[in-house]
Amino acid sequence: MLGILNKMFDPTKRALNKYEKIANDIDAVRGDYENLSDEALKHKTAEFKERLEKGETTDDLLVEAFAVVREASRRVTGMFPFKVQLMGGIALHEGNISEMKTGEGKTLTSTLPVYLNALTGKGVHVVTVNEYLASRDAQQMGEIFAFLGLTVGLNLNSMSKDEKREAYAADITYSTNNELGFDYLRDNMVLYKEQMVQRPLHFAVIDEVDSILVDEARTPLIISGQAQKSTKLYVQANAFVRTLKKDQDYTYDVKTKGVQLTEEGMTKAEKTFGIDNLFDVKNVALNHHINQALKAHAAMQKDVDYVVEDGQVVIVDSFTGRLMKGRRYSEGLHQAIEAKEGLEIQNESMTLATITFQNYFRMYEKLAGMTGTAKTEEEEFRNIYNMQVVSIPTNQPVIRDDRPDLIYRSMEGKFKAVAEDVAQRYMTGQPVLVGTVAVETSELISKLLKNKGIPHQVLNAKNHEREAQIIEEAGQKGAVTIATNMAGRGTDIKLGEGVKELGGLAVVGTERHESRRIDNQLRGRSGRQGDPGITQFYLSMEDELMRRFGAERTMAMLDRFGMDDSTPIQSKMVSRAVESSQKRVEGNNFDSRKQLLQYDDVLRQQREVIYKQRFEVIDSENLRDIVEGMIKSSLERAIAAYTPKEELPEEWNLDGLVELVNSTYLDEGALEKSDIFGKEPDEMHEMIMDRIMTKYNEKEENFGTEQMREFEKVIVLRAVDSKWMDHIDAMDQLRQGIHLRAYAQTNPLREYQMEGFAMFEHMIESIEDEVAKFVMKAEIESNLEREEVVQGQTTAHQPQDGDEAKQAKKAPVRKVVDIGRNAPCHCGSGKKYKNCCGRTE
């Protein structure tokens, strides 16, 4: 009954029927375009753009646009997309995944929706897994687009910012997923809008979509730099704070745990460090270190707030009294306590920006993908990316012979059988592709074949260009190729002369992967475009997957039958058990990726807020209103802390409030206790705010409006960037320890969301306080440069070669871009990183 219902309501079947009708319409107008001259065909692009401007949609133009690309492709490359390729292209245009078997021409299929969507002028990104494929496709398919008058850009890791900007400005941009993600992060660290390279994310077509959105979904892209806080500064600040006297040099409020330098304390600091003004923009880092050292000495008590254990500072939970191992105070307070206790100061490298592929690609207005194998991950694509998987039929029926698995007792017996099978096929001249799960297996089989004197090539997914070349030759007579799973993906194996008569390409699998999709990819290497072929998997009871579903029982059964190591069994029961084991593993992997996304969504929402506001800052001409708003909020919180509602007015610490207001917003003696005595908090706020605004206006008059506007930008950008980087670090530490909350019968995700939100709120307050303090206290130098914004903190540089970190079997791998000290600085100053943003003192 269920089967009948599935047939009636199968969404793929419905979609295919719809696509076939549209493909027939495209076929019907074929003759009209064949008769057009080259010029008339090229002119169609301008005509389509005009019609879009007049209100037509890309859907309205689909039939004509596809017919134009089809004809242009025939004239330029000699390739004419088949009807099934038209159907694949329509699926892509609708933001779905086209599952097209190997050799069915996915690259050519993509040109159809890419052209149609590029007509909008918003830019289309074609995403591939490596730079070799991006370069190859940009060159080959770029000819079709160039013929039709569209521009094509290629975005590579080695390019300068100007070259990248040009590549992104093109109608169509070919790039790798890594480069797109890193460019997005770097764009949100620039100081001037003109330094950004990407345009808003419009439409992306991802080749090998399962590899990028599933296999690499858990891989965070990370831009990191040396931790901005110099160890030396912590030690110096600590030594200085030890010389200060309470109430004379600093004040401490027990209730709020607030510590503040008095005017005397500030003068002492300026003398000790040989500077004119502690609040000058260039002394931001020093000021921060002194504040944290003060807090460490005055507010943080040993054995109350923290303990020292095994040379480490361990935080004590103030509610439960438990030790919170692995957690560190943020904003450099932890390092300040380490300096106070005379311990080694841990100065890890710092995460400056991070995003996962899942969240990067979900930002596109429309997303589509192509692969030979996506059906097994259909649920994941639907739930996480809202994309349907549409299996496109092959142009010619598949006549490949997929043989049942051969199961051996031991690995040794299995590998001997594989070598024997390869040797026999080699003797007849039939080409063989041996697929392995791990590099060690490739090397072991290579050794066995060497012993038999069989020449062969080994591929380990390291050199993409060489790889593509070897894979192309893997279908020639007598070729033997050993490849790990991902090697040579994206390149077709075309059969050489006389190979069809020998049975086509033989694919030999040496074990089942935990994902059926990877097994299907290996099978799909053979039997392309109706060619003959054969696939055979060899398994052993010692394989990891076999051990998972209880191979012991089967082993005992084999023993009873007295089977030796050289005799295989072919059993449907075992094959079914393997498949159900694979389904279980796939389910677990999906759950873990889904969970990662739920955690990552917390940071995603925060990232979007910060990046949006940061862009508004660099895009805005005048930040005065924003800064005034920040000062208001900061002052409101300060007044609320010193005038709590639950206390009587005579209990309020007005002396503390006056000290704070004068040292943070005004000048020594500008506010007296008598000015605010007897007033309500909102009256105090209004009066103090008036005085602050008077000082603000005087400052603007002295320095000139233009200089003041740039100064505000410098202060706001520096505060946002440094606090956001601290926040990313703190969120990372929270994330690493949060699973332990499950032991306390709480939901770790819920706790992470709540604490993450509280930390974000605190970060926003912290930004407002810092902006208020520095705008009011810092002096403006006449030659103010926005680059000063990053002094004392690191920003990013280009990713280094080889950052395509391979996914480990279980744990997520981090893709990290580190900054070389002698590399040119990212901020565009032209100086070396170590002499510019990487300067730590």
From Swiss-Prot:
CC cofactor: Zn(2+)
GO molecular-function term, one example from the UniProt record: ATP binding
Annotated InterPro entries: Helicase_ATP-bd (IPR014001), Helicase_C-like (IPR001650), P-loop_NTPase (IPR027417), SEC_C_motif (IPR004027), SecA (IPR000185), SecA_CS (IPR020937), SecA_DEAD (IPR011115), SecA_motor_DEAD (IPR014018)
PROSITE patterns associated with the record: SECA, SECA_MOTOR_DEAD
GO cellular component, as recorded: cell envelope Sec protein transport complex; cytosol; plasma membrane
Membrane topology, as annotated: Peripheral membrane protein
Region (Disordered) residue spans: 786-812
UniProt-listed Enzyme Commission number(s): 7.4.2.8
GO biological process terms held by the UniProt record: intracellular protein transmembrane transport; protein import; protein targeting; protein transport by the Sec complex
Pfam families per UniProt: P-loop_SecA (PF21090), SEC-C (PF02810), SecA_DEAD (PF07517), SecA_PP_bind (PF01043), SecA_SW (PF07516)
Binding site for ATP: Q85, G103, E104, G105, K106, T107, D492
Superkingdom to which the source organism belongs: Bacteria
Cofactor note: May bind 1 zinc ion per subunit.
Enzyme class: translocase
UniProt-annotated location(s): Cell membrane; Cytoplasm
Main location: membrane
This protein's UniProt keywords: ATP-binding, Cell membrane, Cytoplasm, Membrane, Metal-binding, Nucleotide-binding, Protein transport, Translocase, Translocation, Transport, Zinc
Catalytic activity annotation: ATP + H2O + cellular proteinSide 1 = ADP + phosphate + cellular proteinSide 2
Binding site for Zn(2+): C825, C827, C836, C837
Subunit description: Monomer and homodimer. Part of the essential Sec protein translocation apparatus which comprises SecA, SecYEG and auxiliary proteins SecDF. Other proteins may also be involved.
Function: Part of the Sec protein translocase complex. Interacts with the SecYEG preprotein conducting channel. Has a central role in coupling the hydrolysis of ATP to the transfer of proteins into and across the cell membrane, serving as an ATP-driven molecular motor driving the stepwise translocation of polypeptide chains across the membrane.
Protein family: Belongs to the SecA family.
Protein name in UniProt: Protein translocase subunit SecA
Organism field: Bacillus velezensis (strain DSM 23117 / BGSC 10A6 / LMG 26770 / FZB42) (Bacillus amyloliquefaciens subsp. plantarum)
